[in-house]
Amino acid sequence: MREFNVADGEDWHANNAETSLMLAVAPELVRPQVARQADDPDRTAELVFSHPVNRTSTNGVTGTPSIASAAQGQRAFEWMVDDLCALIERGLRETPPLDHSYFSPVAP
């Protein structure tokens, strides 16, 4: 999933991944005619600090939203759901590192 997220930019604001995801889950919020002409190169790779998008992009986009598709977004959404479910399942099986009651003193 990470590779898809940042394939065209370390900052994935309005890049292929984010635009694809929006095309899959809320297409009415995407302006395809704008996205097709909005590609802007990533200027955030290897930066130490995060900067506001108006300091990293000429038009609010990072990467290549022009290649976005609902199909890519649907796959990304499924990956995200699978990852979240796996994390929840792992959390449900997890036990504390030390077997102490929440109400007992810290030291045994």
Where are the language model's segments positioned?
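Extended, histidine- and acidic-residue-enriched regions that form the cofactor-binding/catalytic faces
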Residues: 1-108
